From Swiss-Prot:
The keyword Membrane appears for this protein: yes
Organism in which the protein naturally occurs: Allorhizobium ampelinum (strain ATCC BAA-846 / DSM 112012 / S4) (Agrobacterium vitis (strain S4))
Gene Ontology biological process: L-aspartate transmembrane transport
Primary role: Responsible for the transport of dicarboxylates such as succinate, fumarate, and malate from the periplasm across the membrane.
GO cellular component: plasma membrane
Protein name: C4-dicarboxylate transport protein
PANTHER family, per database record: AEROBIC C4-DICARBOXYLATE TRANSPORT PROTEIN, PROTON/GLUTAMATE-ASPARTATE SYMPORTER
Subcellular location: Cell inner membrane
Ranges annotated as spanning the membrane: 19-39, 55-75, 90-110, 161-181, 199-219, 230-250, 343-363, 366-386
UniProt KW keywords: Cell inner membrane, Cell membrane, Membrane, Symport, Transmembrane, Transmembrane helix, Transport
UniProt xrefs under SUPFAM superfamilies: Proton glutamate symport protein
Gene it is expressed from: dctA
A Pfam family per the record: SDF
GO molecular function, one term: succinate transmembrane transporter activity
Amino acid sequence: MHISTTTAPQGGKLPFYRHLYFQVIVAIIGGILLGHFYPQTGEALKPLGDAFIKLVKMVIAPVIFLTVATGIAGMSDLKKVGRVAGKAMIYFLCFSTLALVVGMLVSNILQPGAGMHINPATLDGKAVASYAQQAHDSTITGFLMNIIPDTIVGAFAKGDILQVLFFSVLFGLALAMVGDLGKPVTNFLQALTAPVFKLVAILMKAAPIGAFGAMAFTIGKYGIGSIANLAFLIGTFYLTSLLFVLVVLGGVARYNGFSILALIRYIKEELLLVLGTSSSEAALPGLMAKMERAGCKRSVVGLVIPTGYSFNLDGTNIYMTLAALFIAQATDIQLSLGDQILLLLVAMLSSKGAAGITGAGFITLAATLSVVPSVPVAGMALILGIDRFMSECRALTNFIGNAVATVVVARWENELDQTQFRAAMAGELPEEIDVVAEPVPTAA
């Protein structure tokens, strides 16, 4: 089944002003202007962005459940579930670690914090105390135990991605194992997919409003001028993320037979939504629909993307090591090679608990610094004011990384329709594909 969130008029393509990406661009520009010239009004528009993100979160759990459960139920070889998950985790581990190393290398080369000579004792630790407390409350054991929900209803009520994914995988396996007895349930879930994704399409029409409110609030509250003093750090992070996407992920894409720029062009509407809301979670349903439409099998999409939202956060990983070394440089703390290796190892573990929501990267950084004694947690006060401006880049890089991972794993598993994928990358797919609920064959 393929889902489109765009409706084309009969007899031709959509006019440019009706494309979601154009509307979101206009909304972002409008939000920046309003927040800059009327900051108080901009701050007051925060509920618009918050409301849109809540609307999207409302449907994330059903989308994941339906996609994963029906995808696994239709697998004839249940061993493939473990194989897909295993390959995805290997991919995540390799490229998440590479992102951490890239951030560390760039920070050592460009030294964005050098010359600031900040005395850590003069920093206001209270400003980051809440983030440090949240980080302190998070442990690896607690994170792993939290994947198992207390109740099925609780997982859906909280909208916890990993808990919903955990139950969905088990339920899909159970459906496949009961064979024909589970076929009516599978067909019902398949039919239910159509209205749920139609609901997603309806909610996406509010994306420009959400992006406008979120951007107006960001500029109104923090101001464009607030980034001037730390512009070098922001520029370094954006440049590093761009190079990671174009060179590292671009190389992975080329090795697997597609262009990273073509993929970015294909998911441009979702990327603009991430840019406007600073949350990759806001575009999760759209990404899942787009990747399935591009020819990736539902079983792969359903396993890779939701898992990647916790285990494949390239942008967050670049930010963590880059920001940690920036704080050390700014406070004149010399980190030995051993200190940096310790920082890398701790970051490899703490980054796995980061979620795709705004501010999660900052909390994860606090978790890392609280374990590494050499770098003061209070130093995070230096970047607290500009973190919001780096959040967009983190979310965009995370999002592109998960899109690439989905294609790569699908190709490894021979679960990628090459003809359909090439058409998607060339922009040759029709603008509207009817949503049809087709029965999914169950495993015997």
